[in-house]
Amino acid sequence: MRTLFLMTVVLVGACGATNDPINTAQPYIGLQERQDRKTIREFVGVDPVRTEWCAAFVNAILEKDGIPGSASVSDYPLMARSFLEWGDPVEPKDIQRGDVVVFPRGTEGWLGHVGFYVETQGDKWVILGGNQENQVRYDLYNPKRALGIRRYTPPVATVEMSTIEHLNTE
């Protein structure tokens, strides 16, 4: 009688994810919602003239990188604040390039804006996003206004061990 050990490794995650949304977004910088309406609509899936599209842009970039967007955690993925439930929370002192940052917008408590952190310049954060002055561009934001910072962390591999006894190997 022999004992055979079987090990199954299950990798769960975003295969092929680059995790650098700033590089992924480069070809879209400068696109304007009216002038480039068709291109933006095809990429983000909404009409940028009729819909606030910052969250759609972030979701489209994440999807292009093989990363699940806010639709994986929210029934309202087109709302910037849906990203407050996405990924893992990050403290401002630990912010890194590519982290998703959510800011308030307007006076309504449900409104917001979302984009990707690029770097710090002085006392401001450089944020790359869609629907910033009606286009894809870099803008400076006050970090004290951030509602939340989130980061995608790929799931780790899980390992299952099982034992098969009384295996006849003849």
Give the ranges of each region predicted by the language model.
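Active-site signature of cysteine proteases
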Residues: 124, 128-156
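...with weaker cross-activation on analogous glycine-rich loops/strands in unrelated enzymes
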Residues: 22-23, 68-137
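Sec-dependent N-terminal signal peptides
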Residues: 3-13
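General structural signal for secondary-structure boundaries
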Residues: 17, 36-39, 73-82, 91, ...
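Extracytoplasmic/periplasmic, Sec-exported soluble proteins
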Residues: 17, 46-54, 90-93, 107-109, ...
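N-terminal capping segments
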Residues: 13-71, 153, 161-170
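Structural motif marking the loop-to-transmembrane transition
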Residues: 1-4, 50
